[in-house]
A protein has these predicted regions:
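Bacterial N-terminal signal peptides that target proteins for export
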Residues: 1-10
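Transition segments tied to proteolytic processing and entry into folded domains
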Residues: 7, 17-177
């Protein structure tokens, strides 16, 4: 009986730790993304490699830049995304995006102290490029699979659609300040 009680206590203790693995994000508005990012690029991505830093695995994507709205990335820029495969280990991070080769994106990124670039707010800074029926370029961000908190507390995330021209104007205004 004592063994069963100890087993149950251990199981409950482990279950209590499960929520600690969740990802919680602060909601970033388009103005936040524009203002706080190091760079904004329209680009096509390809996975390059993975690495491990402080126990966390990252996948690095090389972005073939077609246009830069902020920063000076050159023809290519690399961004690291939490999660991936490294030396036989796999790590998943809730809310971390996986870029698909051949898909055109607009990516808001920031540069860390080590010089590594990261997508803003995990997937919040990643938009797929599409054209609407009239031919106008629109950017779509998928709904986040993690908890997102705004000024009023927890808010459901439904994704975001933004017109390319609108983003160009916002980025130009911010650059002029």
């Amino acid at each position: 009986m004592r063994t069963r009680a100890l087993s149950l206590a251990a199981l409950l203790a482990l279950t209590a730790l499960l929520p600690l693995a969740a990802t919680t994000l602060q909601r970033l508005s388009v103005d936040d993304l524009v203002g706080k990012s190091t760079g904004i690029v329209r680009a096509t991505a390809a996975p390059v490699s993975s690495f491990q830093r402080s126990g966390m695995i990252y996948t690095t994507y090389r972005l073939q830049v077609s246009e830069a709205l902020k920063g000076s990335p050159g023809a290519t820029v690399e961004v690291a995304v939490p999660g991936g495969d490294y030396r036989g280990l796999h790590q998943s991070v809730a809310g971390s995006p996986a870029l698909r080769p051949g898909i055109e994106y607009v990516i808001f990124y920031w540069t860390g102290p080590s010089g590594t670039n990261y997508i803003m707010g995990l997937g919040q800074g990643l938009f797929e490029v599409h054209k609407d029926p009239s031919g106008e370029v629109v950017l779509r961000r998928r709904a986040m699979s993690t908890e997102v908190f705004g000024a009023d507390g927890r808010e459901p995330d439904h994704g975001l659609t933004l017109r390319w021209k609108e983003l160009q104007v916002k980025a130009a205004r911010q650059a002029g300040q």
